[in-house]
Amino acid sequence: MDQGRQVFSVDLLERYATKNRGMITCMAAGNDVIVLGTSKGWIIRYDFGVGSSNDIDLAVGRTGEQSIHKVFVDPGGSHCIATVTGVGGAETFYTHAKWLKPRVLSRLKGLLVNAVAWNRQQITEVSTKEIILGTQDGQLFEMAVDEKDKREKYIKFLFELEELPEAFKALQMETANISSGMRYYVMAVTPTRLYSFTGIGTLESVFASYKERAVHFMELPGEIPNSELHFFIKQRRAVHFAWLSGTGIYHGGLNFGAQHSYPNGDENFVENKALLDYSKLSDGTEAVKPGSMALSEYHFLLLIGNKVKVVNRISEQIIEELQFDITSDSVSRGIIGLCSDASANVFYAYDQNSIFQVSVIDEGRDMWKVYLDLKVYAAALANCRDPLQRDQVYLVQAESAFTDKEYLRAASFYAKINYVISFEEVTLKFISINEPEALRTFLLHKLDNLSKDDKCQITMISTWATELYLDKINRLLLEDDTAIENRDSEYHSVIQEFRAFMSDCKDELDEATTVKILESYGRVEELVYFANLKEQYEIVVLHYIQQGEAKKALEVLQKSSVSVELQYQFAPELIMLDAYETVESWMANKNLNPRRLITAMMRYSSGPHAKNETHEVIKYLEFCVHRLHNEDPGIHSLLLSLYAKQEDDGALLRFLQCKFGKGRENGPEFFYDPKYALRLCLKERRTRACVHIYSMMSMHEEAVALALQIDPELAMAEADKVEDDEDLRKKLWLMVAKHVVKQEKGAKRENIRKAIAFLKETDGLLKIEDILPFFPDFALIDDFKEAICSSLEDYNKQIEQLKEEMNDATRGADNIRNDISALTQRYAVIDRDEECGVCKRKILMMSGDFRMAQGYSSAGPLAPFYVFPCGHSFHAQCLITHVTSCAHEEQAEHILDLQKQLTLLGSETRRDINGNRSDEPITSTTTADKLRSELDDAIASECPFCGELMINEITLPFIKPEDSQYSTSWDLRSETNLANQRTISLPV
């Protein structure tokens, strides 16, 4: 214990605390509230939280001397119970912090209450909830009081000591909510015994159960009249207890979750029990029993004489002695007792007049040393405040284990030390005694305890540990063959441990250094394992290829973290090692670019293959072309070349006939170079394939010529493919015909019959005269008689058909001429009251009433007009005006220009009529007719109301841009303008 700093200190709180109301007989505290009981029957309440005090006379109305026997205050400082003794017997009172007058608990009259157990978990400011009272007669009662009630709610008898009737001196209670209800834990002490009660339900049912079962108690020899029981409360829960007994201080931990069953069927919640004998406090002299006791987290405060001895609960050593400033009039009795305030974590001592406060200052600061001296290392570590303290605990543990030759255990403790011993000292310790196992253990544990910021140290230690692992593996391999089974087991165990270490430290180990170390020890498998961890897959794959394990290499390459470049890099080796597995791997990976595998595929294809062996490259290329729809010309060309080298040309022809680009707009139908394909097929003598390629390239003459070398039927099919060029098609069929005629070796008449039959296959494209030149000059014409007659008959039919067509054409021309003549005589009948569609005036009006259209001559006295088949009629001038206003600008100008020219020609004619001769009157009239015809076409080709002109007007706006000023004039005026107008009120 640090002697330089006091853990407990004493201060005088109140010198004359009783205010001349007698002498202090008892005291209780809770939540910065102190309640004193005096020898004259007064209770004095000090509330240090608000700085107030008040006193209440409990002896009012009682005769004789009255003294306060005991006072009890709840942990919240609101509720107080006091027992008064005097001539008239004992009486118990209840008072609340807000009250000025006490309330008599009449049902307890005559009972001397020595102890009260508060329900700390349930109590509130306005209600005590259930509490337990212990009496001088050895009885227990349950009671509850509410601040608003005029009397206690109830008082129930719970229990009575029958075997050994003694007074109950102290009580404590704890509760816990569990699934089956409320569990109660009660401890009670008498001068010789400590009783414990527990059960589920209500207090009444719990104590009633002890009629059927034995009460659990602890009895110690000796007797003490002032027996006390204290709980230490931490976070509103009791964690340990202490009983001031006749023999010593019986104490232990409290575990209210424990379910320790005893033979008597009871359950105990006390653990780690111990007894502090009073003889340990006497320094060899006669043991003195304390007059009072208080309990802190780690210490007992024992009142012995006028001193308070502070005893460490763990070490059972006195650490301090507290002195009090006692007045001369208090010497007769000295310090009377101690009490504690669990809520405020302070203690109080009192004599007849004064109150002293005992404060605690960081009482747990040296507890780590106490536990360390007792070798309770876990508790010592739990109480350490800084890394240096923890290091000292670890050092003691390490040195102890090292002394006991438990080197592995010592290594684990040394690894946790950061300050009190250096890394070098520890390693030298293990090296000096030749303990590589312990050294490796130390290094591994040190790695676990280093922070991530110590990168250099972590790398160094990891590398050293790697060498130690490899050294251990080599030593196991070099051991004698004795106990081979055990050696192999240990060897495999170390290998697994080493691999786990590399996996954990892969980011800390320097890659280059570790690889060199593994190579130097010849640990190829571990090197591959480490390379895998570091994602150096090139090393891993190369190792598997060297071992001939293509499948394992492919499994590595298939990992998502492996770069696809390695697939291309090792493709040539892998396909030669295991073509099937390699191709299956390629087909499973959709991200590969087949073009970059061409080198590997060509290497495989260049080698010999069995006749019935599946060509793996062809399989992969077919997968690319048909399943992946690959369009790379290189892939298509390679597949084409492999097909061309096969004995059966069926696959080649099927490939050539496939249109892989069909359906794509503006795209090719195939993706290989047809010229390359042609050269390849010519080289490999794949004639049918060459014919197809020639045809595909529109080289039909070459295709037919080549086809004739192997199969005339194929040549005919090729010739028949040409459909859009009749001359070329005929030329191709002539080539076939010539070949057929020249190649026939039978009798002459038979050859002629076959040639005639061939003509029928051409569907009339070739005539007998087309193939006659192919026959020899000495061929008899009789052999062609039938064919020639048939041909002449066909010509005769064609001539007759042409004559009929000429007659039909003549009749058609006559009909057209008649229709034209009839058009000049066509007329229309109009009503006398018919109106012009534009001006709405009558159509049949005198020319004097209407200005004659320029360029038109009047039809007698009537103005010129137009009548359309639909029934609409228009004056000529109205129609011109309407059409020019609706037509586009260019057409309107053309119409006006024609009208102007007609006007000029009309004026010249009128001058001639007036006496001026015209040299070319006929020419002018002809010109006027042409202009008038053009004008008619421009304005009267269709009705302006029923034709396209009216349809186009749908898209025009109602208000034209030039009429915008009229549009704005129709807008409503603004409110401002309306406000300026004068209004006239109209009578209603």
Swiss-Prot record:
Q: Which UniProt keywords apply?
A: Coiled coil, Cytoplasm, Endosome, Membrane, Metal-binding, Protein transport, Transport, Vacuole, Zinc, Zinc-finger
A GO-annotated cellular component: endosome membrane
Query: Which chain regions cross the lipid bilayer?
Result: none
Assigned protein family: Belongs to the VPS18 family.
Protein name in UniProt = Vacuolar sorting protein 18
Q: Which domain of life is it from?
A: Eukaryota
- Entry-linked PANTHER family: VACUOLAR PROTEIN SORTING-ASSOCIATED PROTEIN, VACUOLAR PROTEIN SORTING-ASSOCIATED PROTEIN 18 HOMOLOG
- What ranges of residues constitute the RING-type zinc fingers? 836-886
Under InterPro entries, the record lists:
Clathrin_H-chain/VPS_repeat (IPR000547), Pep3_Vps18 (IPR007810), Znf_RING (IPR001841)
Q: What is its main location?
A: membrane
The record's subunit annotation is: Core component of at least two putative endosomal tethering complexes, the homotypic fusion and vacuole protein sorting (HOPS) complex and the class C core vacuole/endosome tethering (CORVET) complex. Their common core is composed of the class C Vps proteins VPS11, VCL1, VPS18 and VPS33, which in HOPS further associates with VPS39 and VPS41 and in CORVET with VPS3.
The coiled-coil regions, if any, are 785-819
Query: In the UniProt record for this chain, what is stated about the effect of gene disruption?
Result: Embryonic lethality. Heterozygous mutants produce some yellowish seeds with developmentally retarded or abnormally shaped embryos. Conditional dexamethasone (DEX)-inducible mutants exhibit abnormal root morphology.
CHCR repeat positions: 589-749
Q: Which SMART domains does the UniProt entry name for this protein? A: RING
Cell compartments where the protein resides: Endosome membrane; Vacuole membrane; Cytoplasm
Single GO molecular function = zinc ion binding
The record describes its membrane topology as:
Peripheral membrane protein
Task of the protein? Essential protein required during embryogenesis. Believed to act as a core component of the putative HOPS endosomal tethering complex and of the class C core vacuole/endosome tethering (CORVET) complex. CORVET is required for vacuolar transport of SYP22. HOPS is required for the central vacuole formation. Involved in root development. Plays a role in vesicle-mediated protein trafficking to lysosomal compartments including the endocytic membrane transport pathways.
A GO biological process of this protein is:
intracellular protein transport
Known SUPFAM superfamilies for this protein? Answer: RING/U-box
